[in-house]
Amino acid sequence: MTKTIKLLTYNVFIRPPGIKNNENDWKDERIECLISDSLSPHINYNKGSKSAQGIPNAVYSVDKTSFPYIPYFSPWKYPVYGKLMEVTGMNKKAKSPPPPSSLKQQNLHNNSSDYQSIAPSKSILAQYDIICLQELFSAFSYRQRRFIEKAEQQGFQYYATSPSPPYLRSTFLVDGGLTVISKYPIVASDFFLYEQGVDSDMLSSKGVLYTKIKVVPTGSSNDDENFIHLFTTHMQASYAPKSDGSKTVKASATQDQASNYKNDNIRLIQLNQLREFIFEKTFKDKSIIILAGDLNVNGRVSKDDPKDGDSYLQMLELLSNSDQRDLPTGKKIFTIQDLLRDDFNGEHPPTVGDIKFLKDKKQEIPLETVLTNPNDFGCMKRLDYILLFNREFETSIDGVELNFKVPSPTQPSKHSQQHNSISPLKGSTKVDPFFIQGFPFTQLSDHYGVSTILQINK
């Protein structure tokens, strides 16, 4: 039996109320577009074409006549959902009032006969089977809760979220914003709280959310090949002071790395904590290990060079080698496979701050400016990842003793090919930009998503 599972990681940029990059970030409208099952979403493909960076030229459209009026006291923010459904026309029996004039249509691309329209599923996100979300915060609004309720109605019967911080015992103001929704059973979950961040990140209880998912529901619970270990995280961002020394903002790709020393140092600590947490959760069995999320590490050398950057190589080194005292110093415990990089021939497509060229193809401008922080306009960073961790050790029968094997330089480690029943489908990993037309925003987040297809042979 062969089946496939579609996995997505996506920083959805649904921050707590009042926190935004620009004048308006349209939180409720974007989340409605993502998860509503009444908008009849379609994807308009331009004959499979891609940008110079390899981003698919695919634009979503929804039925604007079915789009609900979203008042200030929106059900996405406040717990009066039932009443508002009747008042705002979200009830199917009532006629929806027209969208406010501020929701004027802005097309990202021209519609033409070159486009092929496909209906992906009930909602934009329902086309996936397992979704890792970052920046879907629960603090001070009902957005995360309503999102999970709507997702459940579309087959995502299982979910896990990062917990609220211990408000009276910490300086954290909000949760970590992590959510996993799944159409397959989540049989275990856990959360590890990172070293506290700096700058504005110090207010968020960032960490890594772990879920163990049974992707072969009818299979034996004693068979490791029926499960995946899935980790999602959102790590310390890079910030730098404005030129006038005022509040911190996101650093541009061209700013000196020394100005971000504080941020980078915290992220290095978090990477070490992440590796040890992954090892702790996975060393007793042989189930496949996947890390998916916004690691805030730029994979590219620079804006114009899509090859492996120094920060990226350092990240892989830290995630691969353990510094535990009870293990050999510097011992490589994982070989890491970057699925997006592999399917892009060793290059890193941008997931934040993409660009487009004017008609003369000489002048480049930022592709998205409504949601993106101005400091990230045109930065062309690759921050979002789906990584496959292959063990470089074997567990003993009792799952305690470790037997390390050093692979031959000319022969790949047998552990890198240990998952015979579950494996990523070669060529399936891609950037999902979630472009949309008909709204003041042209993307559903300031980040692009990254998706892959897992193939199960049982």
From Swiss-Prot:
Q: Which Gene Ontology cellular component annotation is one that this UniProt entry carries?
A: membrane
Q: Does the keyword Endoplasmic reticulum apply?
A: no
Gene Ontology terms: biological process: sphingolipid metabolic process
Catalytic site positions: 447
| Region annotation (Disordered) ranges | 91-111
Pfam families, per the entry: Exo_endo_phos (PF03372)
Alphabetized, the UniProt keywords read:
Hydrolase, Lipid metabolism, Magnesium, Metal-binding, Sphingolipid metabolism
An example of a GO molecular function for this protein is: phospholipase activity
Cofactor names from the entry are:
Mg(2+)
Any idea what job this protein has?
Answer: Catalyzes the hydrolysis of sphingomyelin to form ceramide and phosphocholine.
What's the protein here called? Sphingomyelinase DDB_G0288017
